[in-house]
Swiss-Prot record:
Organism: Mannheimia succiniciproducens (strain KCTC 0769BP / MBEL55E)
Complex and partners: Part of the 30S ribosomal subunit. Interacts with proteins S7 and S18. Binds to IF-3.
Protein name, per record: Small ribosomal subunit protein uS11
Residues spanning the signal sequence: none
GO term, biological process aspect, one: translation
Alphabetized UniProt keyword annotations: Ribonucleoprotein, Ribosomal protein, RNA-binding, rRNA-binding
Similarity annotation: Belongs to the universal ribosomal protein uS11 family.
UniProt KW ATP-binding keyword: no
């Protein structure tokens, strides 16, 4: 007895108008994640995953390319407005925001959510070059 083929239902992309761009800019890499208002990730990209390795990964240009790739991935969701949350002291902070703005998103709010300790852990020693 032949089984009837099971057809997979086509996934319908949900339409999201407002989103949140989480930018994690460390000294070594930049991670861009775009989520909806509830925090469900729509797309993400990193400077390292965009083809930059080693010290080139920690450049503003690498962060810009990562933001452009992430913006391209969320175009299919119909995203228009972005709220930006920046975390970390890295070199890709500004260039990422500029790239998202140039990609056609309306940036409504920019928030710095860098965790600042109330005298918690001892920081790493200063570099002597």
């Amino acid at each position: 007895m032949a089984k009837t083929p099971v057809r997979a239902r086509k996934r319908v992309k949900k339409q999201v108008v407002d989103g949140v761009a989480h930018i994690h800019a460390s000294f070594n890499n930049t991670i861009v994640t775009i989520t909806d208002r509830q925090g469900n990730a729509l797309a993400w990209a990193t400077a390292g995953g965009s083809g930059f390795r080693g010290s080139r990964k920690s450049t503003p240009f690498a962060a810009q390319v990562a933001a452009e790739r992430c913006a391209e991935a969320v175009k299919e969701f119909g995203l228009k407005n972005l709220e930006v949350m920046v975390k970390g002291p890295g070199p890709g902070r500004e260039s990422t925001i500029r790239a998202l703005n140039a990609a056609g998103f309306r940036i409504t709010n920019i928030t710095d959510v860098t965790p600042i300790p109330h005298n918690g852990c001892r920081p790493p020693k200063k570099r002597r070059v």
